[in-house]
Amino acid sequence: MSSSRALVLGAGVAGLTTAIALARRGVPVDVLERDAATAPSGRRGAGSWYRDGAPHAGQGHVFSPKSHQVLADELPDVLRQLLELGAREWSVGPSAGRWDGPTSAESGTALAVRRPVFDWVLRRVAEREPLLRVHSGAAATGLQTSGGRLSGVLVGRAVVPADFAVDATGAFGPVSSWLDDLGHPRLAEPRPDPDTASTGADFYTRCYALHWPGEPGELNLGLAAGGDFGDYSCRVVPADNNTFTVMFTVPAGAPNGAGESRLAPLSSPDGFQAAASSIPAIADWVDPAAAEPITGVTSLRLPPVRRGGASAMARLPGLVAVGDALHTGDPVWCSGMAVALASGLACASAVSAARDGETVDVAARVWDAAADLAAYPACACARMSGPSAGDLAEVLAGSAPVPVG
């Protein structure tokens, strides 16, 4: 492997983690980020920094004990700055609820922080690295190959030479289609487990601020509150500075009319508040006496998740995927941040070793680091009794009273 600069495509969590770790191992690295927006200069803007390339950033993100451990061990300055900005650490145990899938919900020290705050800190840390350059508004448009391996990345009509690049373009990035265009066949990916695979979902999210520190309700899921109510789920995810996020997840094609037509009113502030207030596990959190909303309702539709693997990265030598580009898990499992951090750090470690002359299978090392995290939920979603989707639809339609107390 030559000593030219490494390229990272995408400045999200996985991309910047990879880039920071590469730079700190002495590898010069350029990050190509299609979004032109740069991080706000002041700390006050951290909580409201939303990038077009991360439409899901408004959702509640769980930074599990494994995520926290990675930060403490490998990026302690990032963790320190997050805590200075109001992120919270707290000890959690396994979920008390029943989980019908894999049973390894995590225990340990977790981190409560909003995704925009995390993104802001990570970008600021990256921009201070002497060997790292973030190019905002530089959209990669294709790949160039020579002799059967990567030789460069296209940015418009220009070619940026590279013998190694990291695909951190996310779950629905363009790299796979670029490889199709170059004639590199797709490799078979693992068949989804019908018991755990997602069919896609609609997400409705709103952020609240508590009037005082603490939790007004039980965190019955360890890292969150709420649960799975059959045709939908609803969770409270604690965050920094006494804020929290409430998120409804409505699976695509859900039975009993739980689809868009009946629950679409969740996208309105009044409908969202009424629905959240009708769920006993959530009601205490959104009680106006305890908290007030600080954002509108964000609606987002995600297609079915894609189960990746090491074989999916073997299409073109010199190109390795990290984060969601490597493996897109069901958002309900809350393992995305851990996979992004672990795969990025493993990639940097393997690339650095290869540049030092070791014989390293970079793709295999990256997948090994992510595989265990991708296979199990960080936060189980307990099956709970509560309003059905039909009950929720009636609340949204205004035909049922909102329970009080």
Model segments located where?
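N-terminal Rossmann-like FAD-binding beta1-loop-alpha1 element of flavoenzymes
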Residues: 4-42
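Flavin (FAD/FMN) cofactor-binding and adjacent substrate-gating region
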Residues: 82-117
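N-terminal FAD cofactor-binding segment of flavoenzymes
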Residues: 21, 39-95
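C-terminal helical "tail/cap" subdomain of flavin- and related membrane-associated enzymes
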Residues: 349-405
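FAD/FMN-dependent oxidoreductases across multiple families
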Residues: 252-365, 369-372
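Predominantly flavin-linked oxidoreductase catalytic cores and closely associated redox partners
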Residues: 128-281
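Short beta-strand to alpha-helix junction loop
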Residues: 62-63, 105-124, 174
